[in-house]
């Protein structure tokens, strides 16, 4: 098992360092809560054959079209499971948020295609071999599998819905390792037990790039009229590499994956307050979506919150 995982994980990249130093650079009627998903989620630890009680990973989801949109172009995906043997327990989680663009039909189709194409690739290349009997070693590392999944999604959108585009933030948990594939301006955050909140992805927007270059301030970027214009999105332009980051799981704490309809409307302090006071990730997601709607709900809103074990 050790050799299997060593080959699979490949070279680790410290996501915390990269995110810290970017390049120069209960519910209202408008909220559509998604059912909570609860599954065994242990760290990759040794287990006693006589007493195996893995801790729980709890996942909550929430989504809304918002107050000013008559349709929803966001898509999400969530899968949580655990590989358990008589001596070890390895958690597996795959979570994705995609924010479509290109109009009602094209945007909705692009985001849906993206999550299905990415999920099917990861399940086929990683999940199925990992959980087969006997276990098979995938031919690629986690980073290579995630990169190939993004390319698969990109080409599928170009083929099936020309003119459509979407962001994609895909988070993969395997054992104690976190791998993120990212394109666009949806985001992944680490929320730690000390109350700190860290962005784990970089927005691929023109305004964010101007901020990285020092041409505008963070405050100016937040209200810039072109802040939602992207220079990188799935289904748009030639093939490109997604940003792939790998690190150890930031636990105990939470992972939040969300579209800009959430992070661009309510503040980080509001997000932290809601999560700290909520009784579960599902309730937290419903309350975050409701808060974004109460703030005007200018865009589609999607959130996935994963509570990590101690």
What residue ranges belong to the model's regions?
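PP2C/PPM-type serine/threonine phosphatase catalytic domain
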Residues: 1-310
């Amino acid at each position: 098992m050790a050799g299997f995982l060593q080959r699979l994980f490949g070279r680790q990249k410290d996501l915390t360092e990269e995110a810290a130093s970017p390049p120069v650079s209960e519910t209202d009627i408008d909220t559509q809560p998604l059912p909570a998903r609860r599954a065994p989620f242990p760290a990759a630890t040794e287990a006693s054959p006589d007493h195996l009680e893995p801790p729980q990973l709890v996942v909550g989801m929430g989504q809304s079209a918002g107050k000013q949109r008559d349709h929803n172009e966001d898509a999400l995906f969530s899968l949580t499971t655990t590989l358990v043997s008589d001596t070890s327990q390895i958690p597996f989680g795959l979570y994705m948020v995609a924010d479509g663009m290109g109009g009602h039909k094209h945007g909705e189709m692009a985001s849906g295609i993206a999550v299905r194409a990415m999920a099917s690739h990861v399940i086929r290349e990683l999940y199925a071999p990992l959980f087969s009997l006997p276990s098979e070693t995938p031919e690629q590392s986690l980073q290579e599998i995630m990169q190939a999944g993004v390319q698969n999604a990109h080409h599928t959108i170009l083929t099936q819905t020309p003119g459509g585009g979407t962001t994609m933030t895909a988070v993969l948990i395997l054992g104690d390792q976190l791998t993120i594939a990212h394109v666009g301006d949806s985001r992944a955050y680490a929320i730690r037990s000390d109350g700190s909140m860290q962005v784990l992805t970089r927005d691929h927007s023109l305004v964010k790039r101007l901020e990285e270059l020092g041409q505008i301030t963070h405050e100016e970027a937040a209200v810039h009229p072109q802040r939602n214009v992207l220079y990188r999105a799935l289904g748009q332009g030639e093939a490109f590499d997604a940003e792939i980051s790998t690190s150890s799981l930031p636990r105990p704490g939470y992972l939040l994956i969300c579209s800009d309809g959430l992070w661009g409307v309510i503040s980080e302090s509001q997000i932290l307050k809601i999560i700290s006071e909520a009784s579960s990730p599902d309730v937290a997601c419903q309350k975050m979506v409701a808060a974004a709607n109460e703030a005007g709900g200018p865009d589609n809103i999607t959130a996935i919150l994963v509570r990590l074990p101690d």
